[in-house]
Each structure stands twice: as structure tokens, then as C-alpha cells.
């Protein structure tokens, strides 16, 4: 950074320092800082203690024959009674609120138009950062669906000033590039499909390879720059070493900052970003948290953003949050009735998590018109959970083979050979797949039922492999386990039919980039299997399911420990995340990002629930709080 007085950025030893961390010491510093929790990181609630050991129950078979020994896991029951769900009400579905929102949307569009452009002499010192900050704020507040055209125009403007080796400054006439503006631009432009290289971050290192910034910046401005550097680093592609360095460095720096600065809206924003990052972040949860802190940071509220009315953006965000909250309650009431009336609702061997699945769906898809996607996702995931518990624990090997064969024949008359509990599961599955295929035909213009059935057949075959492993006590190799586990994870079946109900056309050439055997599908399935195993392997083992990525790795590597296996798998997960970023955002893709975004967000939703434990099986702590915060509770207007 020639011709500019700079300071190397090192982890602050006290509040007064303006520097961060050297590349040579960053690994050591990170190990130190991550060993001790930061002072105000939100405490994890104590896990609900559940007896996950196998319970064996005796059942007489339906033909009056001998007594069958069945395996049942001790899952906690549904936490949300239908009577409670049906009692929910919200005033925010009224026309007065939607009319107010329409008015504010137009006012925000005018705000976009008021930002100076290159045809005006004034405003040239901050026009780039203002546009980026507007786009970033709107997206984090969950109101970006109203401003897609304005966002594209703003980012085209920013990109026109992007320099591959230097990035950008705050404005088009800025003398020097700026780390905050460049990091925010790198992240935002990349997420919108622009071809930007992370090599630009090398410009912001000194001669010793340390990240650096101008000495004239305040501590708050430096911290904001590092926060956006961290956010940018999370959308890394494979092989981007500078992004890895930026992530390690910025995470360490921000954790140290949190131990020094007082509690504020800015500190809470940092905490949220560090906790959820990008791959476990849910858009609606982010909007809920950002509403609480938005516009209170003195740096962002200063005169450096004279064309931005933060209170107007906040007003719209609150209105939109509550209007959608009203729709959520109606959809949730429908789902609760559907579950209560379903054939499988009375089954006691399985987890009933329809409310939790709805929460996931509505946290990643907030457009009112995507109701079919949300409802289809819930129904699909509920049935996949029932099937998972049936194949893993309750069903006998002979029964499971009968069910698999009956499904492949796709004929209701085949249910006569099934035990009663399987008839209930088969009926629900048959009705749901036909119903969702009809929904998909409305948007895709073609019958997708056979396509979906093929995906389920592969899924059930993988279930059968695992059931046979459990029955025989066989422990496969890691490669054999993962090949089958990608399919049995359910990532493909949980994703495929819901995304076909969206209003986004998915012709075959796009499906080939999302569905099996695409690299996108392979990565998403691997991530769900590996992350799920790291959170569930002990409980699964207690239920008699010995095969997991951890146990299979240890078998392949005699003398290795569980810690060795977990370290290896976590590296695989990190690498796969960067690859999945590339598959979503690659500039040379034939299909638009929008066509793959919901599939990508489903992966993020699963990762969120597996962040600390199996948040589906044990849904009484973090998951329950998520339901309350994003579905049941409105924000104060």
C-alpha cells in the first residue's frame, strides 16, 4: 500500500491498539483464543438429557404369529400441540400493514435513486461504499425481494470501478483503495455472480505479509473493516489461500475485540456473525437479529452515509417481518392439521418434528409466493424422518424388504402384504408424492413423479444397505460407508421435490447441475452425512447403529482415536464447503444462482440444526428458541 501511512493489523492487547495479527503467528493466536470462550458469546443451553440407549419392545406380528423384538429409540415427543398451534393469531395480516409496507418500499427505492452517480460532481468520495452498504443492509434485514432491480443497478455501478489488483475505495474518486469497501464488495459481488478474485486482498498486506490498514482510521472503523473481511472470507473458493488466511486472522481478531469492548449493538452483531457465519446462517434468523442492532452503530449512523435513512429501512424490515409472521402462522396451522390427520401421526417409534421443519423452511424462503415450497419441504422431511426411524430401528429386515419392494411397484394393492404400521407410512408417502408432483407440474409444466420416485428408490436401497449392516454387525470401510451414506442422508430427496414447486423453471440442463449425479448434489449430500455423523454418532451407537463416518475411519486407520477421525472429517467438511460455494457461485455456470439458491439454502438449514448437536432429535433447546424467535414471536413495531 504505497504512499499511505499504514499500521500492521495484529490481535489487540488492549482497547487502545490499532493493529491485528501477523500471518506467521495467526495459527498460534487462533489456538489460544479459541481455547477460551469469549466473554459475551451467548451461552449454549444445557443439552436435554435423553436416554438414547436402545429399548427393545415385544410386538406380536399382524398375522397372529410369534412375538417380534423391535428396537425403539427414546425420542422426546412433539413439543407443539395442535390445540396450541390452532390458537395462534396475528393482526399483521390486515391490509393496513401491507399498504404501509408498499408505501415504505417506494420510499426506499427513492433512497436508492438519491445516491450520487458518476454524472454528478458531488458525492464521489462515498458513492461506492454507500451502494454496497445499502445492498448489504437490505439483504441482512430480509427485505431484498422488493429491490432486485435496484440491487443489480447498484452492483453494476460498483463493479464498473472494481480493480482486480486493488479493489475499490469508498468512492469513485477515492485516492486509495479501502479494506472495508473492498471486503464488502468482494463478498457482495461474488454472492451475486460477478467475477471477482480474492487476490485483491493481497493488496492489503504490508511487506511482511501482515494485513494492514491506514493509521488514520478509528478503532471502530478498523473493527468494521475486519468484520467485513471475515464475512468475505467465508465465501471462499477452493485453493484461495488468502481467504483462508483472512478467515483465521479476522476470526481471532474479532474474538479478542469482543473481550475488550463494552456490550453494544455492534458487539452483538459481531457475536452473531462469528456464531453463524455463512454456512449455518438462516436469512430469517439473521433478519430477526439484525433488526435488533441495525442503525445503532455510531460509525454507520454518522454523516458518512447522508443518503441513507436507516430508520426507514428498519421500519420496512419490521413491517415485512410481522406480515410474513402472520402468513407463517396460517401455514403452520395447516401443517399441524395435516400432521394430525396423517396416517403416521400416531406412530410412537418416530420423531414428530413438523413444526421444526416448517421453521427451517420459512427461515430460508421468506417470499409469500413460495408457500408450496415451504409446505412441501415440511411434508417431505416429516415422512423422511418416519422412514429413517423405521429403517434404522423399528422395522425388521424382512418387513423392510417388503416395504422397499412395494414402493418400487407403486401400487396401493401392494400394501396388503405390509404390517399395519407400514401401511400407514406407505399411504402417507403415496399421497404426499402424488400431491407434490401435481404442485410441481403447475410450475415446471411437466410430470416429475417418475423422476422423484427414482430418487426415493435409490434412497430406500441405501436404507436397506444400512439395515443389513445393523442386522449383521458389519462395519464397512470409510469409502463404502460414505458412498452409501451420501444417499441415505436424504439430502437429495429432501431437496428435489420441494424445489420443483418453486416458480423458478428447472429444465433438465439446470437439474443436471443440482441433482444427482452432479457435483453440487454430491457435495451437499456429503456435507449432510459428515456433519450429521459428527453430531449423532454416539447416540446412534447407543441405539445399535455402529457404522458412522467416525467408526469407519477408525477401522481403516488402526490406532487412530475418535479425535483423529473428527479432525479428518472436519477438514473434509471445510473443503467441501468451499467447493459447494464454487458450485453455487461459479461465474461460468450455465444456470443462474437463483435456480440453485434454494437447494443451497436447504443445505445451510441442515447445517444450522447440526451446529452444536442433532437439533432435530433433541429439539427442546436451541431449536425451540429458533421456533419462538422466527415463527411464533413478532417484533415490536
UniProtKB/Swiss-Prot annotation:
GO cellular component: a single term: chloroplast
GO molecular function: (4S)-limonene synthase activity; magnesium ion binding; pinene synthase activity
Keywords: Chloroplast, Lyase, Magnesium, Manganese, Metal-binding, Multifunctional enzyme, Plastid, Transit peptide
Reactions catalysed according to its record: (2E)-geranyl diphosphate = (4S)-limonene + diphosphate; (2E)-geranyl diphosphate = (1S,5S)-alpha-pinene + diphosphate
Motif DDXXD motif location, chain numbering: 388-392
Name of one Pfam family that matches: Terpene_synth
Subcellular localization: Plastid, Chloroplast
Sites where the protein binds Mg(2+) 2: 388, 392
Record GO biological process: diterpenoid biosynthetic process
Chief location bin: plastid
Cofactor(s), by name: Mg(2+); Mn(2+); K(+)
CDD domains from the UniProt entry: Terpene_cyclase_plant_C1
Keyword Transmembrane helix: no
Pathway, per record: Terpene metabolism; oleoresin biosynthesis
Binding of Mg(2+) 1, residues: 388, 392
Domain comment as written in the entry: The C-terminal part of the protein seems to be involved in the cyclization step(s) required for the synthesis of pinene. The Asp-Asp-Xaa-Xaa-Asp/Glu (DDXXD/E) motif is important for the catalytic activity, presumably through binding to Mg(2+).
Miscellaneous field: The conserved 70-Arg-Arg-71 motif may play a role in the isomerization step of the terpenoid cyclization reaction sequence.
Function of the protein: Involved in defensive oleoresin formation in conifers in response to insect attack or other injury. Involved in monoterpene (C10) olefins biosynthesis.
The name this protein goes by in its record: Limonene/alpha-pinene synthase, chloroplastic
Species annotation: Abies grandis
Higher taxonomy: Eukaryota, Viridiplantae, Streptophyta, Embryophyta, Tracheophyta
Gene assigned in the entry: ag11
Amino acid at each position: 500500500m504505497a504512499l499511505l501511512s499504514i499500521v500492521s493489523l495484529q490481535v489487540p492487547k488492549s482497547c487502545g491498539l490499532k493493529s491485528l495479527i501477523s500471518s506467521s503467528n495467526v495459527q498460534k493466536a487462533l489456538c489460544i483464543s479459541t481455547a477460551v470462550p469469549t466473554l459475551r458469546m451467548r451461552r449454549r443451553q444445557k443439552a436435554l438429557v435423553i436416554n438414547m440407549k436402545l429399548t427393545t419392545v415385544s410386538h406380536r406380528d399382524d398375522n397372529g404369529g410369534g412375538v417380534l423384538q423391535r428396537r425403539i429409540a427414546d425420542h422426546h415427543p412433539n413439543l407443539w400441540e395442535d390445540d396450541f398451534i390452532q390458537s395462534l393469531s396475528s393482526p399483521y395480516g390486515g391490509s393496513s400493514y401491507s399498504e404501509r409496507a408498499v408505501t415504505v418500499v417506494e420510499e426506499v427505492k427513492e433512497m436508492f435513486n438519491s445516491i450520487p452517480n458518476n454524472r454528478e460532481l458531488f458525492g464521489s468520495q462515498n458513492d461506492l461504499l454507500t451502494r454496497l452498504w445499502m445492498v448489504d443492509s437490505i439483504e441482512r434485514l430480509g427485505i431484498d425481494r422488493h429491490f432486485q432491480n435496484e440491487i443489480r443497478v447498484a452492483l453494476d455501478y460498483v463493479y464498473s470501478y472494481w480493480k482486480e489488483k486493488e479493489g475499490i475505495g469508498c468512492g469513485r474518486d477515492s485516492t486509495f483503495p479501502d479494506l472495508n469497501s473492498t471486503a464488502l464488495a468482494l463478498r457482495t459481488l461474488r454472492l451475486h455472480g460477478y467475477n471477482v478474485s480474492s487476490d485483491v486482498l493481497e493488496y492489503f498486506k504490508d511487506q511482511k505479509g501482515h494485513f494492514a490498514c491506514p493509521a488514520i482510521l478509528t478503532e471502530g472503523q478498523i473493527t468494521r473493516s475486519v468484520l467485513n473481511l471475515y464475512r468475505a472470507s467465508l465465501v471462499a473458493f477452493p485453493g484461495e489461500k488468502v481467504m483462508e488466511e483472512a478467515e483465521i486472522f479476522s476470526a481471532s481478531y474479532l474474538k479478542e475485540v469482543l473481550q475488550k469492548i463494552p456490550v453494544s449493538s455492534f458487539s452483538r452483531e459481531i457475536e452473531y456473525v462469528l456464531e453463524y457465519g455463512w454456512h449455518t446462517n438462516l436469512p430469517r434468523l439473521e433478519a430477526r437479529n439484525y433488526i435488533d442492532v441495525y442503525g445503532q452503530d455510531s460509525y454507520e449512523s454518522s454523516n458518512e452515509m447522508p443518503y441513507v435513512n436507516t430508520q426507514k429501512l428498519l421500519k420496512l424490515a419490521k413491517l415485512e417481518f410481522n406480515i410474513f409472521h402472520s402468513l407463517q402462522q396460517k401455514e403452520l396451522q395447516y401443517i399441524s392439521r395435516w400432521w394430525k390427520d396423517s396416517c403416521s401421526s400416531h406412530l410412537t417409534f418416530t420423531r414428530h418434528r413438523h413444526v421444526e421443519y416448517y421453521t427451517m423452511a420459512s427461515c430460508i424462503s421468506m417470499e409469500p409466493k413460495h408457500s408450496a415450497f415451504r409446505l412441501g419441504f415440511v411434508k417431505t422431511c416429516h415422512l423422511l424422518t418416519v422412514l429413517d426411524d423405521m429403517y434404522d430401528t423399528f422395522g425388521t429386515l424382512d418387513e423392510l424388504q417388503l416395504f422397499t419392494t412395494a414402493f418400487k411397484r407403486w401400487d396401493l394393492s401392494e400394501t396388503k402384504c405390509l404390517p399395519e404400521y407400514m401401511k400407514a407410512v406407505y399411504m402417507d408417502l403415496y399421497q404426499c408424492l402424488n400431491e407434490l408432483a401435481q404442485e410441481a407440474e403447475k410450475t415446471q409444466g411437466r410430470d416429475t413423479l417418475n423422476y422423484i420416485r427414482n430418487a426415493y428408490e435409490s434412497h430406500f436401497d441405501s436404507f436397506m444397505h444400512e439395515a443389513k449392516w445393523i442386522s449383521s454387525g458389519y462395519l464397512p470401510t470409510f469409502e463404502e460407508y460414505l458412498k452409501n451414506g451420501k444417499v441415505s442422508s436424504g439430502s437429495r430427496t429432501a431437496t428435489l421435490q420441494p424445489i420443483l414447486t418453486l416458480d423458478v423453471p428447472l429444465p433438465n440442463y439446470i437439474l443436471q447441475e443440482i441433482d444427482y449425479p452432479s457435483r453440487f448434489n454430491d457435495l451437499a449430500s456429503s456435507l449432510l452425512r459428515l456433519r450429521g455423523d459428527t453430531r449423532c454418532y454416539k447416540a446412534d451407537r447407543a441405539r445399535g447403529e455402529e457404522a458412522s463416518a467416525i467408526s469407519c475411519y477408525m477401522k481403516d486407520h488402526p490406532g487412530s482415536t475418535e479425535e483423529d477421525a473428527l479432525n479428518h472429517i472436519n477438514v473434509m467438511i471445510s473443503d467441501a464447503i468451499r467447493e459447494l460455494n464454487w458450485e453455487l457461485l461459479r461465474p461460468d455456470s450455465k444456470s443462474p444462482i437463483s435456480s440453485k439458491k434454494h437447494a443451497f439454502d436447504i443445505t445451510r438449514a441442515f447445517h444450522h440444526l447440526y451446529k452444536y448437536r442433532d437439533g432435530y432429535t433433541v429439539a427442546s433447546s436451541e431449536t425451540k428458541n429458533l421456533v419462538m424467535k422466527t415463527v411464533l414471536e413478532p417484533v415490536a413495531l
